[in-house]
C-alpha cells in the first residue's frame, strides 16, 4: 500500500513502484542538497584528546561540556551529525582516526548512534557511550563528569 499522487491510499503496483523510485531519487540527491552533514568544532590541526559525537538535542550540552573540558587543558573536538542517511562516513572517519577517546552522547538506552557509527565506518575504532534515557535532556555537567570518568 502506498499513497497516490493525490495522497489517497492505493494498492496499484505501478503507483507503488513510481512512489518508491521518487523516494530513492530524493535519497540519492540528499548529499548534494545537504552540504554539511557533520558540524564540527575544535582543533583541526592535530589529534584530539576527546571527540564528542552527538545529534539532535545533545548539541548545546556537548558544546558547553567541551568548553569546560578545554578549560581543563584537554584538546576536545565535537562532531554533531545532522544527517544519518546516507551516513556521512567520509566526513566522520578522519575525525575518528585523529581522536584518542571517542565518546558518543545519546538520549537512549541502547547506544543506537554508536552502533550505526560502528556499522558505517571501519568498526575498529573504540567508541564509548554516554547514555541517558530518563526522558530528560543532558546537562553539560553530566557530560563533563562522565567524560572525566571515562578518559
Roles of regions detected by a PLM:
Residues 1-151:
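Flexible, low-complexity linker and terminal segments
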Amino acid at each position: 500500500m502506498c499513497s497516490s499522487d493525490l495522497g489517497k491510499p492505493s494498492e496499484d503496483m505501478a503507483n507503488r513502484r513510481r512512489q518508491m523510485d521518487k523516494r530513492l531519487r530524493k535519497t540519492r540527491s540528499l548529499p548534494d542538497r545537504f552540504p554539511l552533514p557533520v558540524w564540527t568544532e575544535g582543533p583541526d590541526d592535530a589529534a584530539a584528546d576527546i571527540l564528542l559525537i552527538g545529534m539532535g538535542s545533545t548539541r548545546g550540552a556537548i558544546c558547553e561540556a567541551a568548553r569546560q573540558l578545554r578549560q581543563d587543558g584537554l584538546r576536545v573536538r565535537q562532531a554533531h551529525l545532522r544527517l544519518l542517511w546516507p551516513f556521512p562516513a567520509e566526513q566522520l572517519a578522519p575525525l575518528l582516526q585523529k581522536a584518542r577517546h571517542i565518546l558518543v552522547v545519546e538520549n537512549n538506552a541502547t547506544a543506537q548512534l554508536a552502533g550505526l557509527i560502528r556499522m558505517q565506518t571501519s568498526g575498529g575504532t573504540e567508541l564509548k557511550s554516554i547514555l541517558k534515557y530518563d526522558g530528560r535532556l543532558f546537562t553539560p555537567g553530566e557530560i563533563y563528569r562522565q567524560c572525566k570518568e571515562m578518559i
